[in-house]
C-alpha cells in the first residue's frame, strides 16, 4: 500500500500544490514500483487549516486538487493499472466550515443542531472556564468558547470541532458518505483517529496534564473507549454490502488493545505503530514483530507494518539520530549536528527490506522509496502545520515530512510541477529525485522495486508470506528470520560486522564484504 499526500505528490496545473491531475500522471510510476493499492490523504473540500483533515464536505473534492469527476476518473485509471484506491475518512471531527457547524453556531444552546457536536456550558463564574481539563492534541485546551458563552469540544485544532456520535444524524451521515465513495469504486477507507470518536458520559476531568500527541495513555475519557466498537461494526456492515472492500484503522493504542479493533466484524487492518516508534534495536524489533504477529493471528487478521507517514519525522532521519533523542523536539531545538544522515539512510534501506520480508501488509509513505529524509531546515515563516501555532511555537510540527516530492534532479520544483512548490524543497532532494535514481543500480528506488517484485512473486506463488515466521540465531544485535519458501532476511542492527548464514544473496541494502554483513545492513538469502 502506497500513501499519497495529495498536496505534495505531483502538481498537474503548475500552481505549486499537488492535485489529482498530477496523481494521474504518475500512475505509471506507481505501477512500475509494484504497489497493490494507494491510500489517498483527505482530498475533500476543506479550508486546509490542518492539511485536509478539516473536512467541510465529504462528497466534494477540494477545488485546489480537482473535481469529484476527476477523483472518479483517478479511481478508474488506477484500476486499469491494477491499483486499488483507499480514501481517508475523518469521522471524529469536521471542519468549522462544515454546514452542520455553521448551523450550530446560528442555533441556540440546547438545539438539535448543537447536539451534533459537543457543546457545553462552562465552569466558574459566568461559565468563563472550560467545561473540563481535556487538552487538544495540538496543544492547549480542547475547548473553545462561542459568542453566546457555550464551549465546543475539539480534540485537535479549534477549526476541527468533534462530532457527537450519540446523535443519530452523525451515524447516518457517515454511512451515506461511505456508500458515496464505495459506489464510485473506492476499495475502502483509512479511518482517521479511529481510537477517538466517543467520549465518556458527563465529560469527566481527565485528571492529568498530558499531551503526547498520540493518544496512547490508558483511561483517558475520550480515547480508546469500548463504546466506539459498535460504530465500527456498523461501518463493517456497510462495507460488507460490497465485494472485496476494506478498512484500516489509525489507532494509536497499546499493543494489547489493538486486537479489539481487528475482530472479524470490525476493521480488516490496524496500523502497527510500535515498529515506527521503536529505536534501532534488535531486541525491541524482535519483540514488537513477535507480539504483532501473535496478536493478529489470534483474531484472524494480519499485521500492518509502517515506518513513516504524514504525521511523523521520516525514518531516514529518525534512524540517523542518537538513541534517546526525541525527533519532534530535535527538529526545533537541535543540536542539528547530532544527525548522521548517512547512517540514517543506511538504516532506512535495511528497514525497508525487513518490513517487506515480513508476513502481513506493508504501507509505504510517498518518498520512502526514494530514501527522502525529513526537511528539517524549513524556515519558520513557511510552516503551515497548526501544531506550530497551537503549541505556541514549542513544537515545529509535521511540515518537514510533507515537502513536495522531487521527480527530476533539475528545474524550479525538481519535476513536481511547472511552477514552484507550496513548501520549499531542500537542496539534497535533487540528488534523491526519482529521475536521478532510475539509472543508478544501487539506488533506493531500485531496491524498493526489486524487493516489492520478489514479494509479489512470493505472494503469487503461494509460498512463504502466509507461513509462520521462524527466528534465526545470528547474534544478539541481529534480526534474522526465515519462512517456508526458504527466503531468509538478516538485518545487522549492531555496530560490528556479523557472519552471514550460508545461502545465495538475493537482495542487499548495501555493499557486502565477503561473508560479512556490515552494520546497518540487511540481506535476503535463499
Segments the model singles out, each with a brief description of its role:
Residues 1-502, 508-509, 513-526:
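Active-site and adjacent substrate-binding regions of carbohydrate-active enzymes
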